[in-house]
Amino acid sequence: MLEGNLNYTGAVITWLKDDLKLISSAKETEGLAREANPADRTYLVPAFTGLGAPYWDEKATASISGITRTTGKAEVIKAALDCIAYQITDLVRAMEQDTGMRIEELRVDGGPTRNGYLMQFQSDITNKRVNIPDAEELSGIGAAYMAGISAGVYDLEKLAGNMKRSVYEPKMDDEIREKKYAGWKKAVDGVLSK
C-alpha cells in the first residue's frame, strides 16, 4: 500500500461553496461539470497552502489559468473537480516512477466518490480503473476489519468478496489524456516558487 500527501483536494469544493459562493452544496458540482464546455482549458491549481506531493513547495500559490471569454461558472466548477483528479494523477505517476511498478486500480473512498463526473475523470486521466466501495468512509471500517482478521473473527477473502462496489473504467483517448495532463503540468509550473 502506498500513500501520498495532498494539501487541498476535496476542500476545494468547500472553497467554491463557502468562499466563492458558486454553489450551495457539493451535489451541484456534478451537474455543472457536465454542463461545462468540453473544449474549455481552464485549470485550477489549489495551492492555497502550498503544494504537497510530489512538488513539496510550501510557497506555491493558487491560480486559475486558461480562462477565455467563454469560461463561466460551470467551467470553473469543472476545473475545481478536475484539479482533484490531476493531483491524484501526479501522485500515481510519482509512485509508479519511484517503485517501478504499475498501479492497475485505484480504490477510493470519501465524500467526493459520490460525484460520478469526478470518478470518471479520475479514471480517464489516470488511465486506471477506479473502484469505489458502497461504504463511504472506509478508514473506520478498515480498522475494525483489520482487528477482526487479526483476532481470527473475519476472513479476508470473504470480507473482500462481500463488499459491493462501483467501478469506473478509463474511456479517454490517450492523446487527449496526455494533452490535458500537459496543460495541468504547465499550470502547476506557473505557481511553483522554485
What role is predicted for each listed range?
Residues 1-194:
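Glycine/Thr-rich phosphate-binding loops that ligate phosphate moieties of nucleotide
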